[in-house]
Curated annotation (Swiss-Prot):
Residues 21-534 are extracellular. Residues 21-52 form the LRRNT domain. The keyword Zinc-finger does not apply. LRR repeats lie at residues 53-74, 77-98, 101-122, 125-146, 150-171, 174-195, 198-219. GO terms for cellular component: cell surface; plasma membrane; postsynaptic density membrane; presynapse; Schaffer collateral - CA1 synapse. It is found in: Membrane; Synapse; Postsynaptic cell membrane. Forms heteromeric complexes with LRFN1, LRFN3, LRFN4 and LRFN5. Can form homomeric complexes, but not across cell junctions. Directly interacts with 2 NMDA receptor subunits GRIN1 and GRIN2A. Interacts with DLG1, DLG2, DLG3 and DLG4. Glycosylated. It holds the Pfam family I-set. It comes from Homo sapiens. This is Leucine-rich repeat and fibronectin type-III domain-containing protein 2. Residues 289-375 form the Ig-like domain. Keywords: Cell membrane, Disulfide bond, Glycoprotein, Immunoglobulin domain, Leucine-rich repeat, Membrane, Postsynaptic cell membrane, Repeat, Signal, Synapse, Transmembrane, Transmembrane helix. Residues 383-424, 577-602, 619-654, 668-702 are annotated as: Disordered.
Length: 789
C-alpha cells in the first residue's frame, strides 16, 4: 500500500513539473524534448520559473537587458538558445557555464559592446554563434577558446570591429561560414585562412582593407563544381566595398578568374575609382624603398640612452630593421626598442654598442640600407674596496705630482716602503646648502688631457652622478645638491691612449664635503612674521595719525566756539552821547535839578568800529558841521564821535560787509526823512540841506560808496536799522527837548528792528529834524546797533 502511494505521489509531482510553464510563455512537450517559447512577450528579464529540462528556449523580441548566472543555471540539456532582438548590454561572466549541450546561440540585434574572455565560457559543443548587429568594438583573445574545434558558423557582421583574434580564427578548422562584413577591419594577418579547408563562405564586404594576404584558399573561389570535393568545397568569397591599394601586392588576386566585377581600386591616385578586374596586370607596380632621413654619427656617454632614427618611403610602405655592429638583428627587449616609424632606442648603452648600426628598409620591390656610427665614451668604474678607480692598464701614472702611491700590502715584489700620503689635488670650497666649488690641479708632465670627468654621489645612496668638463677648465660649480648631506667627489682625467687607441682614464683626486643645513620652513615663517609685523606697524601709524588729526580738529572747534560769542558780544564803553560833542561831563558839572546820568547802556557790534580811515575822516567832518548848525538853530545836536580804539586784527569779510550795510541803511533813512519833511519845517530843511552838502563825504554819498564796495547788491541782503523805543521816541518828538540839551535816560522797553517794524506796521515816517532831535534828546545808551551778519 505504501509503495502504491509513493508511486502516485511521484507521478503527480512529475506531471505538475511538466505542466509548469512561465506566464505568457508556451511550453511544448514533444516526445522527449521540452520547448519553451516566449517570443515578443515584453519580458524585461529571463523568467526564473523556466523548466530546467528545457531543450529549446526562445526569448527573442523582448526587452531583456542583463544576463546573469542564475538565468540558465542547471540547464544542462539546453540545445538551442535564442536571445535575438533584445536590448542586452551586459552578460555576466560564466552565465553559460552549465550549457554544455548547447549547439546554437543567437545573440544578434542586441547592444553588446564587447566579448570578454569568460563571457562565452562553458560552451564546449557550440556550433553556431550569431552575434551580428551589435555594438562590438573588441573581442578578447580567449573569447572563443572553448569551442574552437566545434564551431561551424560564426557571424560577426554589422559591428564596429577593428580587429579579431586572428590566432583563434586560424584554429577553427571546422568553420564553414565566416561573416565579417560591414566592420572596420583594416588588416588580416597572413596565413589566417591557411588551415580552414572546410570554409565555404567568406564575406569581407565593406571594410577598410587595402590589401589581402596571399593564401591558397582564395584559389578555390574559381574552382568549378566538378573539381570540388566534400573536404574542399568551392569558396564563396566577397570583398567588395574595400579601398583596395592596387599595386604589385594584389597582383596574385588580379590573376584569379572571377565573374563579378564590383570591386574597385581606392589607391594609388592613377587607379583610384577603376574596377579592380579591369586594371591590367602591368599597372600593378610597386616602388622600391628610399631612406630619406637617418642619424649619421652619435657620441654617447656609457650608461646613457641613445636614439637612432631612420625614415624611408616606398610603395608599399617599407619595413625598417636594425642590425647591430656584431651582425645580430636588434629587436624589442628590456634594453632596446624598435618602433614602427623606424626609430631605435637603446635605453642603456654599453661598450659593445660602439660601432656601426645598419638600418635596412625593405618592401616587395626591394630594400635600402644606411649606416649609423655610434661612439661610446667609456667611464671608469669604482672598485668595491675603495672609492678610487683602479685602471689596471692606465699609463697616466703621473697625472698629478703625487699619484705614484702604493696600493697597499699584498703586492708581489713589493719591497719598497709605503710612501707618504699624496697631497690633495682636489679642493672643495664655497660650500652652500645646494652648491659647492670644486678646484683641481694637474702636473705639467701629465699627457694631454682630452676632458675631465667629475663624479660624485650622496653618502646615503650609491647612485653616481657624472659631469663632463672641458680640458681647459680646472674648476667647476656643482649645483642641485641636498642640504645637510655628505658627498664623495672624485675628479678623473681622460686622454687618448696611443697604444690601445682607446680612451684611457686616471684619477686626479677625491674629496669629501658636507653641505650646509637649511631650514626653509623657519625662514619662511620668519619672513611671514616679519611681513605681518610691518603691515601692523604701518597700519598703527596710519590709525594714530588719523586720531591725532581728529583730536586737533576737535580742540580747534571747541576753542573757536568759546571765542566767537565773546568777540561778538564785546561791549564798547567809550561811546558817548551824540549831543554833547565831548567827553561826558562829570557829575559836578551837571545842571542843577538834573538827575544823575547813569552809565552808558549802548552796545555796539564790532562791525561798527571797523571803518576805514577815509570813512572815519568823512564822519568827523560831517559831525563838526552838523554841530555848528545845531548850536545856531538851538537844537543842541551833537555829532557822532567814535573814539579811536586799539588796533584790531584784519576784519573778516562778514564784518566788513556788515559795516557797509549799516552805512547804507543810515543814508537811506536820512533821505527818507528829508523827503517827508513838513511845510512848517521847510526853512529849517533848507538850512539843513545846505549843511548836508557840507557833511557829505567828498567821495560821494555813503550809500553809493558802500554799494560800490559790496560784491553783491544790497537789495539781496537783509537790511537792519537802529532799534529804539517806540513810545519814548514818539514822546520826545512831540514834547520837544529838555532845556540844556540833555534828556534823562529812559528805559528802552521795546526794541524793534526796521524789518520788525515794517512787518508789524509800526514804522513811522519821522522827519530828519525830529529824528535828529530825538537822537539829541536820548542818550547814546538808548541806541542799539544790530549786526548784519
Amino acid at each position: 500500500m505504501e509503495t502504491l502511494l509513493g508511486g502516485l505521489l511521484a507521478f503527480g509531482m512529475a506531471f505538475a513539473v511538466v505542466d509548469a510553464c512561465p506566464k505568457y510563455c508556451v511550453c511544448q512537450n514533444l516526445s522527449e524534448s521540452l520547448g519553451t517559447l516566449c517570443p515578443s512577450k515584453g519580458l524585461l528579464f529571463v523568467p526564473p520559473d523556466i523548466d530546467r529540462r528545457t531543450v529549446e528556449l526562445r526569448l527573442g523580441g523582448n526587452f531583456i537587458i542583463h544576463i546573469s548566472r542564475q538565468d540558465f543555471a542547471n540547464m544542462t540539456g539546453l540545445v538551442d538558445l535564442t536571445l535575438s532582438r533584445n536590448t542586452i548590454s551586459h552578460i555576466q561572466p560564466f552565465s553559460f557555464l552549465d550549457l554544455e549541450s548547447l549547439r546554437s546561440l543567437h545573440l544578434d540585434s542586441n547592444r553588446l559592446p564587447s566579448l570578454g574572455e569568460d563571457t562565452l565560457r562553458g560552451l564546449v559543443n557550440l556550433q553556431h554563434l550569431i552575434v551580428n548587429n551589435n555594438q562590438l568594438g573588441g573581442i578578447a583573445d580567449e573569447a572563443f577558446e572553448d569551442f574552437l574545434l566545434t564551431l561551424e558558423d560564426l557571424d560577426l557582421s554589422y559591428n564596429n570591429l577593428h580587429g579579431l583574434p586572428w590566432d583563434s580564427v586560424r584554429r577553427m578548422v571546422n568553420l564553414h561560414q565566416l561573416s565579417l562584413d560591414h566592420n572596420l577591419l583594416d588588416h588580416i594577418a597572413e596565413g589566417t585562412f591557411a588551415d580552414l579547408q572546410k570554409l565555404a563562405r567568406l564575406d569581407l564586404t565593406s571594410n577598410r582593407l587595402q590589401k589581402l594576404p596571399p593564401d591558397p584558399i582564395f584559389a578555390r573561389s574559381q574552382a568549378s563544381a566538378l573539381t570540388a570535393t566534400p573536404f574542399a568545397p568551392p569558396l564563396s568569397f566577397s570583398f567588395g566595398g574595400n579601398p583596395l591599394h592596387c599595386n604589385c601586392e594584389l597582383l596574385w588576386l588580379r590573376r584569379l578568374e572571377r565573374d563579378d566585377d564590383l570591386e574597385t581600386c581606392g589607391s594609388p591616385g592613377g587607379l583610384k575609382g577603376r574596377y579592380f578586374w579591369h586594371v591590367r596586370e602591368e599597372e600593378f607596380v610597386c616602388e622600391p624603398p628610399l631612406i630619406t632621413q637617418h642619424t649619421h654619427k652619435l657620441l654617447v656617454l656609457e650608461g646613457q640612452a641613445a636614439t637612432l632614427k631612420c625614415k624611408a618611403i616606398g610603395d608599399p610602405s617599407p619595413l625598417i630593421h636594425w642590425v647591430a655592429p656584431d651582425d645580430r638583428l636588434v629587436g624589442n627587449s628590456s634594453r632596446t626598442a624598435v618602433y614602427d616609424n623606424g626609430t631605435l632606442d637603446i635605453f642603456i648603452t654599453t661598450s659593445q654598442d660602439s660601432g656601426a648600426f645598419t638600418c635596412i628598409a625593405a618592401n616587395a620591390a626591394g630594400e635600402a640600407t644606411a649606416m649609423v656610427e655610434v661612439s661610446i665614451v667609456q667611464l671608469p668604474h669604482l672598485s668595491n674596496s675603495t672609492s678610487r678607480t683602479a685602471p689596471p692598464k692606465s699609463r697616466l701614472s703621473d697625472i698629478t705630482g703625487s699619484s705614484k702611491t702604493s696600493r697597499g700590502g699584498g703586492g708581489s715584489g713589493g719591497g719598497e716602503p709605503p710612501k707618504s700620503p699624496p697631497e690633495r689635488a682636489v679642493l672643495v670650497s664655497e660650500v652652500t646648502t645646494t652648491s659647492a666649488l670644486v678646484k683641481w690641479s694637474v702636473s705639467k708632465s701629465a699627457p694631454r688631457v682630452k676632458m675631465y670627468q667629475l663624479q660624485y654621489n650622496c653618502s646615503d645612496d650609491e647612485v653616481l652622478i657624472y659631469r663632463m668638463i672641458p680640458a681647459s677648465n680646472k674648476a667647476f660649480v656643482v649645483n642641485n645638491l641636498v642640504s645637510g648631506t655628505g658627498y664623495d667627489l672624485c675628479v678623473l682625467a681622460m686622454w687618448d691612449d696611443t697604444a690601445t687607441t682607446l680612451t684611457a682614464t686616471n684619477i686626479v683626486g677625491c674629496a669629501q664635503f658636507f653641505t650646509k643645513a637649511d631650514y626653509p620652513q623657519c625662514q619662511s615663517m620668519h619672513s611671514q612674521i616679519l611681513g605681518g609685523t610691518m603691515i601692523l606697524v604701518i597700519g598703527g601709524i596710519i590709525v594714530a595719525t588719523l586720531l591725532v588729526f581728529i583730536v586737533i580738529l576737535m580742540v580747534r572747534y571747541k576753542v573757536c566756539n568759546h571765542e566767537a560769542p565773546s568777540k561778538m558780544a564785546a561791549a564798547v564803553s567809550n561811546v558817548y552821547s551824540q549831543t554833547n560833542g565831548a567827553q561826558p561831563p562829570p557829575p559836578s558839572s551837571a545842571p542843577a535839578g538834573a538827575p544823575p546820568q547813569g552809565p552808558p547802556k549802548v552796545v555796539v557790534r564790532n562791525e561798527l568800529l571797523d571803518f576805514t580811515a577815509s570813512l572815519a575822516r568823512a564822519s568827523d567832518s560831517s559831525s563838526s558841521s552838523s554841530l555848528g548848525s545845531g548850536e545856531a538853530a538851538g537844537l543842541g545836536r551833537a555829532p557822532w564821535r567814535i573814539p579811536p580804539s586799539a588796533p584790531r586784527p584784519k576784519p573778516s569779510l562778514d564784518r566788513l560787509m556788515g559795516a557797509f550795510a549799516s552805512l547804507d541803511l543810515k543814508s537811506q533813512r536820512k533821505e527818507e526823512l528829508l523827503d517827508s519833511r513838513t511845510p512848517a519845517g521847510r526853512g529849517a530843511g533848507t538850512s539843513a540841506r545846505g549843511h548836508h552838502s557840507d557833511r557829505e563825504p567828498l567821495l560821494g554819498p555813503p550809500a553809493a560808496r558802500a554799494r560800490s564796495l559790496l560784491p553783491l547788491p544790497l537789495e539781496g541782503k537783509a537790511k537792519r536799522s537802529h532799534s529804539f523805543d517806540m513810545g519814548d521816541f514818539a514822546a520826545a518828538a512831540a514834547g520837544g527837548v529838555v532845556p540844556g540839551g540833555y534828556s534823562p535816560p529812559r528805559k528802552v522797553s521795546n526794541i524793534w528792528t526796521k524789518r520788525s517794524l515794517s512787518v508789524n506796521g509800526m514804522l513811522l515816517p519821522f522827519e530828519e529834524s525830529d529824528l535828529v532831535g530825538a537822537r539829541g534828546t536820548f542818550g547814546s545808551s538808548e541806541w542799539v546797533m544790530e549786526s548784519t551778519v
